[in-house]
Amino acid sequence: MLTIAKDQTQVNERIRAREIRVIGQDGEQIGVKQKREALEMAERVGLDLVVVAPNAKPPVARIMDYGKYKFEQQKKEKEMKKKQKVINVKEIRLSPTIEEHDFQTKLKNGRKFLNKGDKCKVSIRFRGRAITHKEIGQRVLEKFADECKDIATVEQRPKMEGRQMFIMLAPIAEK
């Protein structure tokens, strides 16, 4: 089910506090006023009274155009979303007895993922009695990490989890 975030901004009649610190439309501080008095001041200039700091004692309200304020808030949110980068984790599966050409193919794919900025989880699945030779799998993972050391850092050393051993590689951050 989709939840819709409701606007929690206190505006005009929705302000719950009796006394509020009022800031004028040009930014000058008017002082602590009763709610009714502050609302009348805002109505006289044809603007809204918007609480900008509800946790302050007393709450801080500013005389401004609420529509413009809401638009500015939405614009800031969009900018924040643009700056966020989604990091995907791509997985490459190897076997402890992988041949050299297959290893190079998997390595090429891993380097492609790392160059795109994705993290890379390289895992080895031990089948049957191969689990008795964990050191072979560890050598394969360390070789993979060594081949990628120019573009990636080891985020998590080789670790055993059930019948799988994996290593986590992260791309080197560009400055």
UniProtKB/Swiss-Prot annotation:
Source organism, top-level taxon: Bacteria
Tell me the GO molecular function terms: ribosome binding; translation initiation factor activity
Protein name, please? Translation initiation factor IF-3
Question: Sorted alphabetically, which Gene3D superfamilies does this protein's record hold?
Answer: Translation initiation factor 3 (IF-3), C-terminal domain, Translation initiation factor 3 (IF-3), N-terminal domain
Q: Which UniProt keywords apply?
A: Cytoplasm, Initiation factor, Protein biosynthesis
Annotated Pfam families: IF3_C, IF3_N
- Name the job this protein performs: IF-3 binds to the 30S ribosomal subunit and shifts the equilibrium between 70S ribosomes and their 50S and 30S subunits in favor of the free subunits, thus enhancing the availability of 30S subunits on which protein synthesis initiation begins.
**Compartments where found:** Cytoplasm
Where is it chiefly localized? cytoplasm
* Biological process terms in GO annotation: ribosome disassembly
The annotated subunit structure for this chain is: Monomer.
Q: Which InterPro entries match?
A: T_IF-3_C_sf (IPR036788), T_IF-3_N_sf (IPR036787), Translation_initiation_fac3_CS (IPR019813), Translation_initiation_fac_3 (IPR001288), Translation_initiation_fac_3_C (IPR019815), Translation_initiation_fac_3_N (IPR019814)
Supply the source organism for this entry: Staphylococcus carnosus (strain TM300)
Q: Which family does it belong to?
A: Belongs to the IF-3 family.
Q: NCBIfam families annotated for this entry?
A: infC
Q: Does the keyword Protein biosynthesis apply?
A: yes
The terms describing its cellular component in GO are:
cytosol; membrane
